[in-house]
């Protein structure tokens, strides 16, 4: 019986596709197929509470389940799916994912996080696996330990602290270029204006100094990667290996990108070895040559750090700029704080108890990089809000439900109010704030990301005052306004910059 169930799971996507090809000619036919498949999936993946009540959740959707909804429409779906209760189930293709929304369930799930496994390719299918499936953030067990041990030293708190002067210089140069190329007052699209800073700041940390030609090549590789992610986000048959034969042009683009991306890293490695540099790429690629890391583990992890996190870093930084522009009293207080610490700026940026640090934290709270966390599973059975979830079942955290939880954050949880952190014990944030992940698999780049955000904001405010353009409705400054073309909520707002007659430092 177990063998039959396993076989059914293996062939299920193919059966669904073949049946759908014959029947999917109307909305009624689609509804019938989705309803039947939902019932079958529920039977194959039973989850009940102590009274025998089955877990609820949205109906399976053709081929993709709720995968695209999670990535592209997460904030809206968070609201829509509230009706299913504090714990519910969605589908990634035909793979079940249990969604948890309460801090107590987050704690219950993560208590054994050191034994958790990330879902294969984030349950996103074949094409996603070709791009990122072997990256550090999506592998588990001894492989994860091996890859993380290679990249962790370069992103540890001590290592990042030593890079403070370089990050500050990069931020200053970026802002200076922005200032020189514009008039005394101008308006920019926030995400577009800041995107290249975190990208090239991270690239410099990985590779050391790059020539202008190399920087242009790297940016172009990033754009090609984003194009491939566009195919991932279109879903459908890109979820399955059959896409290799159905979409030859896209697959050729994929193969060309992967070849060029590996070639770029190998060339930079040889160049840096030749001049005696000891940048992270030298150590990482040496492990590839020695056979300690596979080529896929290396280039997928580098893709994760640079390309996948480009949208994440751009989103975080652009929302920080927007919130400062929309909350001018807070901006004024930050400006005063920077002026007071103008003789110890590196020490100031390293602190976690400043208003600037709280602005970064509040931005990450209000705008987590994704509405639903990367799926992971515990080998142990879990009881989540009364439902018994079998071991090795994918679980995701509804990050907005945690970060906007009125029981912890108060009635004005949706308001940008960084001073709220003055009175909150940081230990209390452990299961009440989702920023860079939770448990032992917390994002490796958290220290670097926070440092980039602080230095960029500091240098930007040194040269400019920020405002929401007067023709824009300020009442909409904190409403949903994001791009739908990326897998994280990139801001789609404008900010007005006014040059200061005199800098703060």
Swiss-Prot record:
Glycosylation-annotated residues: 316, 392
**What EC identifiers does the entry list?**
1.-.-.-
Functionally, this protein is described as follows:
Cytochrome P450 monooxygenase; part of the gene cluster that mediates the biosynthesis of an unusual class of epipolythiodioxopiperazines (ETPs) lacking the reactive thiol group important for toxicity. Firstly, L-tyrosine is prenylated by tcpD, before undergoing condensation with L-glycine in a reaction catalyzed by the NRPS tcpP leading to the diketopiperazine (DKP) backbone. Afterwards the alpha-carbon of tyrosine is oxidized by the cytochrome P450 tcpC to form a hydroxyl group.
Protein name (database record)? Cytochrome P450 monooxygenase tcpC
* GO terms assigned for molecular function: heme binding; iron ion binding; monooxygenase activity; oxidoreductase activity, acting on paired donors, with incorporation or reduction of molecular oxygen
Q: Which InterPro entries match?
A: Cyt_P450, Cyt_P450_CS, Cyt_P450_E_grp-I, Cyt_P450_sf
Alphabetic keyword roster: Glycoprotein, Heme, Iron, Metal-binding, Monooxygenase, Oxidoreductase, Signal
Which family, according to the similarity comment? Belongs to the cytochrome P450 family.
Known cofactor(s): heme
Q: Where is the signal peptide?
A: 1-26
Query: Its induction, per UniProt?
Result: Expression is positively regulated by the thioclapurine cluster-specific transcription factor tcpZ.
- The UniProt annotation places heme binding at 443
Please state the pathway this protein functions in, per its UniProt record: Secondary metabolite biosynthesis
